[in-house]
């Protein structure tokens, strides 16, 4: 049986199609020289994974993050190169452990705006903004839904503009991607406030409906993820890709 499932996996899995959040430097963003391609630290990590499992991984731009998740649900993409853990996502994707990166989600506000923030409840009564379909961990997502006033917008650029034009009191977003976009848009007068909203793990996921989702393939990917984690490659990739993103934006 093991042999026949291997043959089946090899027949249906000549390549794997991967995608992710395209507004996510230094992790992922669209290649300025080929807008159908995603580049960044996660994309480079996926190429190392590809070598380990012996199957080419094609990292394509599919659309914004909301659409990406829909495509994963339908099995039109195989892998997501970076997703937070949420219960609803378990219904359509398998997660691989360990996580390949821990990220910090922070509160952004204007430098001249006083936001006395030490805990989540300090945000009650203030107008927040974030990007549609973003999750910041189950606990915060639930709290935000029940207690906070947060507008959802399609892109991080729009959210940062709203914040700098005082149409929102605060923005919730991850620190590294936020810093990358602030640099790109040349916005000044914004700051982050401590403590972080959450420290969240980024995982590799495989769609349940992917033709490549076989026990043999899951085992192969799981082994490779474990090996790459032990080699601690991600920190080096992030440093290099922050530099690459800045260089591209200043052209």
Question: Model regions: which residues?
Answer:
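Short loop->beta-strand "edge-of-pocket" segments that line small-molecule binding or catalytic clefts
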Residues: 15-22, 28, 119-134
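Flexible hinge/capping segments at coil-to-helix
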Residues: 109-127, 215
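Short helices/loops that flank or line small-molecule/ion binding pockets
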Residues: 51, 61, 66-78, 95, ...
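Periplasmic-binding protein-like
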Residues: 22, 102-106, 183-222, 244-250
